[in-house]
Amino acid sequence: MILRRRGIVLSFHSNMVTVEDEETGERLLCKLRGKFRLQNLKIYVGDRVEYTPDGTGSGVIENVLHRKNLLVKPHVANVDQAILVVTVKMPETSTYIIDKFLVLTEKNELETVLVINKMDIYDEEDLEKVKELERIYSKLYPIVKTSAKTGMGIEELKKYLKGKISTMAGLSGVGKSSLLNAINPGLKLRVSEVSQKLQRGRHTTTSAQLLRFDFGGYVVDTPGFANLEIGDIEPEELKYYFKEFNEKQCFFSDCNHIDEPECGVKEAVENGEIAESRYENYVKMFHELLGRGKS
């Protein structure tokens, strides 16, 4: 009798699933048991599964084990943390994009590391932009400054990645694949050139896949994003995902920090305790979500 084993889903190939055995590290191409189709059961990259090996390097997935979380875009299960890779040019990542991403990671209760990449190409003006990002975010999230070309920050970033399942995201062209190759050269990911006209890279990743680091841990390399959807968040819920807002006392317990009097958040913005860009981006998102409700 062949005993069931446990593994983790790395990627999909048509109707087949690549599974890595959690004990041996062996990779098998597995089919799904018929009940998945009959019961419309879903399976995602990052899922921990029970499977039955057939002894020839293949197997059949029997069950999906309990998920601690499931990200929607991209669909990834059991993620421990998010790594947001940003650049201040070629392309420039706006604080609005950063804050939208952070709203999503806060909503999904993920630890987040902000990586400022391409440090080797920045002039004095660019370095001032880097300092501004540090001023805005360093008290809220860990920041690692990196260069895949010079190796700057690579060892520091490895410490955050070791032993965890991380999702890495960022605008196309910020250098995610180059960073991953610098962190773990054995990955040999394809790297794109950045278009000077659009200042965006060509997408080198077309679907989510789980990549294993030699030093332990996994990363989900996902397609670059240009638009982040926060449409399933209620306007009144948004404030909870700007975590520095939660420390402030307002006169009204249900204050949305927009037009209400005696608002602790607005006072903190005026006093310089909360970054103006964070508050402006919050207000913009709040009105976007309100407008969605009226359409």
From Swiss-Prot:
Which UniProt key words apply to this protein?
Answer: Cytoplasm, GTP-binding, Hydrolase, Metal-binding, Nucleotide-binding, Ribosome biogenesis, RNA-binding, rRNA-binding, Zinc
Please tell me whether the keyword Cytoplasm is annotated for this protein: yes
Asked if Kinase is a keyword of the record, the answer is no
Identify the cofactor(s): Zn(2+)
Name of one Pfam family that matches: RsgA_GTPase
Binding positions (Zn(2+)): C250, C255, H257, C263
Q: What domain of life is recorded for the organism?
A: Bacteria
Enzyme Commission designation? 3.6.1.-
Q: Where does GTP bind?
A: N117, K118, M119, D120, G170, L171, S172, G173, V174, G175, K176, S177, S178
Which one of the record's GO molecular function terms can you name?
A: rRNA binding
Q: Which InterPro entries match?
A: G_CP_dom, NA-bd_OB-fold, P-loop_NTPase, Ribosome_biogen_GTPase_RsgA, RsgA_GTPase_dom, RsgA_N
Q: What is its main location?
A: cytoplasm
**Note on cofactor:** Binds 1 zinc ion per subunit.
What GO cellular component is one of the record's annotations?
Answer: cytoplasm
Assembly and partners? Monomer. Associates with 30S ribosomal subunit, binds 16S rRNA.
Task: Give the UniProt family note.
Answer: Belongs to the TRAFAC class YlqF/YawG GTPase family. RsgA subfamily.
**Matching HAMAP family, A to Z?**
GTPase_RsgA
The UniProt function text for this chain reads: One of several proteins that assist in the late maturation steps of the functional core of the 30S ribosomal subunit. Helps release RbfA from mature subunits. May play a role in the assembly of ribosomal proteins into the subunit. Circularly permuted GTPase that catalyzes slow GTP hydrolysis, GTPase activity is stimulated by the 30S ribosomal subunit.
Q: What protein am I looking at? A: Small ribosomal subunit biogenesis GTPase RsgA
